[in-house]
Amino acid sequence: MLDYPYENEWNLGVDAAIGRRFGRHTLVFRAGFEGRWGGDRKGESVWAAPSDYYNRTYSGAFRYAYRARSVDMEFGLDYYRDDVAGRDAANYFIPYAHLRFDLGGGGFVPYVELDGTLKHNDMRELMETNLYYVPRYTDPMPRNTVDYSVRVGVSGRLVEDKLIYRLFVGYSFIENHNFWYCYTPTTRYEGFSLVQGRLNVMSLNGELEFRPVSNFTFSIGGRGLTYTEHQTLSIGLPEFEGTIRARYHHRKFSVGLVFDLQSNRYISRVIPWFPNDGIVGNMRIPYTVDLGLNVDWYASKRVTVFAEGHNLCNRRIYDWSAFPQYSACLLY
């Protein structure tokens, strides 16, 4: 085990919004600030550095919406000013447009969606994403990830709203995507780190939900993905994801079954400190099948007792290569 320093972090977020509705029109203005500060590192190791870090984001947004019987539309613009310690401040403008056209009484609704997000890459977020992350304290923290996305598709409700479907094609342009890599097991530095780069993602998505009776729901969904990366490292993402869900509701309890599938993934193995030049191969994360069960018992109007089961097929599941989950697990 590598004894590297631990990190403290605290955050502060403030949001405000003002809007007005007149007839079928709506105007909304939003402003916000989110800051994360860290430092006070403890311990001594080759990874340590004396500098603290901060991750501050200033945001603003404008929305105009118009809603009618067969047409819903919303337009706007999001602004982010990103300030990460050790990095030049960056400004991002993300357009926003959602258009929906009901051409068949809810049964056939074409739509177009254009939007985006900013995802923080502070210490807490990275450790929640990958528990085996070993930061290099001699480098600044990574930039925040910005995602510009567009989706074109159709949705609808059929058979007296018992059948709901959604089909769409999506395309995302991702700036500062985190390309994770793992260190070679032949070195004393085991764990994961990352480099950042651009990634383009195209996806074909389908979702179907069937409710034959009011207290039972069955749904199935899947998506195929293709990637255009601008890095020599493997992206560590699947080319197919699928989900099957079933849930039964009763006045006193509910039972849900979840079946998740994920295709093979590959993560690069590198020699420490040389993520682009020291690649020694790829680690394959095998096809994942995960069966889960969750039960809720409504003991009273205010008290619910729950139980959840995960990996009930008792397979070796890898969230990250070289670190598998073993056996089934239960949570009460």
Language model features by range: what are they?
Residues R124-R143, I174-L199, L225-T243, L261-Y298, ...:
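Outer-membrane beta-barrel domain signature, especially the mid-to-C-terminal portions
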Residues L2-D3, F22-R24, F33-G39, Y66-S70, ...:
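Transmembrane beta-strands of outer-membrane beta-barrel pores
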Residues Y6-V14, D52-Y58, A89-P95, N144-V150, ...:
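Residues that define the transmembrane beta-barrel architecture of outer-membrane proteins
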Residues V14-R20, F33, G60-Y66, A97-F101, ...:
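Residues on the lipid-exposed face of transmembrane beta-strands in outer-membrane beta-barrel proteins
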